Swiss-Prot record:
Pfam families: BE_C, Glyco_hydro_57. It comes from Thermus thermophilus (strain ATCC 27634 / DSM 579 / HB8). Catalyzes the formation of branch points in alpha-glucans by cleavage of an alpha-1,4 glycosidic bond and subsequent transfer of the cleaved-off oligosaccharide to a new alpha-1,6 position. The branch chain-length distribution of the reaction products shows degree of polymerization (DP) of 3 to 13, with two local maxima at DP 7 and DP 11. Exhibits an alpha-retaining catalytic mechanism. Is involved in glycogen biosynthesis. Shows a secondary activity, i.e. the hydrolysis of the substrate, being 4% of the total activity. Optimum temperature is 65 degrees Celsius. Remains fully active following incubation for 1 hour at 80 degrees Celsius. Changing residue 184 to A: Complete loss of enzymatic activity. Binds amylose but not glycogen. Pathway: Glycan biosynthesis; glycogen biosynthesis. The keyword Zinc does not apply. GO terms for biological process: alpha-glucan biosynthetic process; glycogen biosynthetic process. This is 1,4-alpha-glucan branching enzyme TTHA1902. InterPro entries: 57_glycoside_trans_central, BE_C, Branching_enz_MT3115-like, Glyco_hydro/deAcase_b/a-brl, Glyco_hydro_38_N_sf, Glyco_hydro_57/38_cen_sf, Glyco_hydro_57_N, TTHA1902. Optimum pH is 6.5. Substrate binds at residues 265, 282, 404, 460, 469.
């Protein structure tokens, strides 16, 4: 029987103590309210009803650190209370109008959010850990701060990202991970490497897979074009493609020379959900993400149609929208059945950014729940975790370099806009290697410098600069972490060190000795 491996990738960059709105902590609070808590509620309902449809959830280390942070928990509680008050105000304003149903829905949603968060004692990480212990999900890890693996300038820098990600996972989930989400599905094989800007030396470098295997990781995921050739898919919101026929290679389990096993993203199921023109989120009944109430900032309108201007958006009808998710779930499972019929021994890998569901596509979590319920009783397709999917026979494969970004290469993260970013990253990585080797700086200073370097390396900063979504914020953030890093190496005062330790506090186990990788 064909196996279906759903993989959700949950990630947000480090925003704790770095602004509130529109690009700071509120972006995390939105994802907590609209994606992570609703997903936990789905898992709680399925567990209570004995519905078995396992899937894989990647929680990046930097996201797990923030979800577990006391400041973030307190901030989220205040945020959700504020949103409830706004919703109540909207309900009073819109009673007797076409927006009343949406306003009533908003009040109920925020009441449920506060009640659920309180019931969990604010511990979302523990809720996901409980779901894994119950066999509902498989939790996997990633690079510590979502560093872009192929472009990090030194093997030691990539090793520190991987190993810190593994140890952070171990602390939160009390076990060692075997699965790994490659940030941006970006991979580089073993071979000659030349830095895109001045800094690191040229030379032959180990493949990303070799370092993953050394860290105890046994499988990961790549985009379809890395195993089948051809054009890469566009990211969500850009694709205007119709159905694409997968080549046979995407249904195989692949094994690299290092022993790492790899699954490839399935194009058909990807486009059905991600495509802006072809996918489910463009349904006219679903809630419009971009139009917000001018007073409350809440959403009360629907997509209406894909080409509608914001002023043309019609009032949102929650009942009709959530009913539509059932229809779309049946359609998706029908697609899986057709693919399974053509590839009865294959693996259908469907990886998505978790935040697409609930945040960008408000009804998306309800759609996921409907899909899981249908799959639990489906005789043609078996839902499995990625760990189960990679078992058994595999095809020996050599992968090219690439990513799931636009063009299938590194252009989103490496371009004219981001050259200064990479120059600062490489300079800091080289300085960190040297400082770790010399061993002169106090342990606390070196440890905090490592945190600042990890935060500097986050792939979010070049991504946001390239897309223009938050270019000024991204530039401010990477420059801030670079300044902090070099100030620490030059000699920060005890007061300055304490201030940085309070502001940038992830990874208590940060180990500067990881930058001695070659001697290890």
């Amino acid at each position: 029987m064909a196996r279906f491996a759903l993989v959700l990738h949950a990630h947000l960059p480090y925003v704790r103590a770095h602004g509130m709105w529109p690009f700071g902590e509120e972006t995390l609070y939105e994802a907590m309210a609209e994606t992570y808590l609703p997903l936990i509620r789905v898992l709680e309902r399925l567990r209570a009803e004995g519905v078995e449809a396992p899937f894989t959830l990647g929680i990046t280390p930097i996201l797990a650190e923030q979800l577990a942070d006391a400041r973030i928990k307190e901030g989220f509680w205040a945020y959700a209370k504020d949103r409830l008050e706004r919703a109540q105000g909207d309900y009073q304003r819109y009673r007797g109008t076409a927006l009343e149903a949406s306003a009533r829905h908003q009040v109920a949603f925020w009441e449920l959010t506060l009640d659920h968060f309180q019931r969990l004692s604010g511990d979302l990480v523990a809720a996901f850990r409980k779901a894994e212990e119950g066999g509902q999900v498989e939790l996997i890890t990633s690079n510590a701060t979502h560093g872009y693996s192929p472009l990090l300038g030194y093997d030691e820098a990539l090793w520190a990202q991987i190993k810190t990600g593994v140890s952070t996972y171990r602390r939160h989930f009390a076990k060692d991970p075997t699965g790994f989400w490659l940030p941006e599905m970006a991979y580089r094989p073993k071979g000659p490497w030349k830095p895109p800007v001045e800094g690191p030396p040229e030379g032959v470098r180990p493949g990303v897979d070799e370092l993953l295997m050394r860290a105890g990781i046994r499988y990961t995921f790549v985009d379809a074009h890395l195993v089948q050739g051809g054009e890469p898919l566009s990211p969500y919101g850009e694709a205007a493609l119709g159905p694409v026929e997968s080549q046979e290679a995407t249904y195989h389990v692949h094994e690299l020379e290092s022993g790492l096993r790899v699954l490839a993203r399935n194009p058909e199921t990807t486009l059905q959900v991600w495509s802006a023109d072809y996918g489910y989120p463009g349904e006219g009944l679903y809630r419009e993400f971009h139009r917000k109430d001018p007073l409350s900032g809440l959403h009360h309108w629907r997509v209406t149609h894909r080409k509608a201007d914001l002023a043309e958006k019609a009032p949102y009808d929650p009942e009709a929208a959530f009913a539509k998710t059932e229809e779309h779930a049946r359609h998706f499972v029908g697609l899986l059945e057709r693919l399974a019929g053509r590839h009865p021994e294959g693996v259908i890998l469907s990886p998505y950014d978790a935040e697409l569901f609930g945040h960008w596509w408000y009804e998306g979590v309800a759609w996921l729940e409907a899909v899981l319920r249908l799959l639990a009783q489906n005789p043609k397709v078996r839902p499995v975790t990625a760990r189960e999917a990679v078992q058994g026979p595999a095809v020996r494969t050599a992968l090219p370099e690439g990513s799931w970004g636009r063009g299938g290469d590194h252009r989103v993260w490496l371009n004219e806009k981001t050259l200064d970013y990479w120059e600062k990253v490489y300079r800091a990585e080289g300085a960190m290697r040297e400082a770790a080797r010399r061993g002169v700086l106090p342990e606390g200073v070196l440890r905090q410098a490592m945190r600042e370097l990890l935060l500097l390396e986050a792939s979010d900063w070049p991504f946001l600069m390239e897309t223009g979504q938050a270019e000024a914020y991204a530039r401010e953030r990477y420059e801030e972490h670079a300044r902090a890093f070099f100030h620490l190496l030059k000699g920060a005062s005890p007061e300055e060190l304490r201030a940085l330790e309070e502001r940038d506090n992830p990874f208590p186990e940060a180990d500067p000795r990881l930058y001695l990788f070659r001697e290890a």
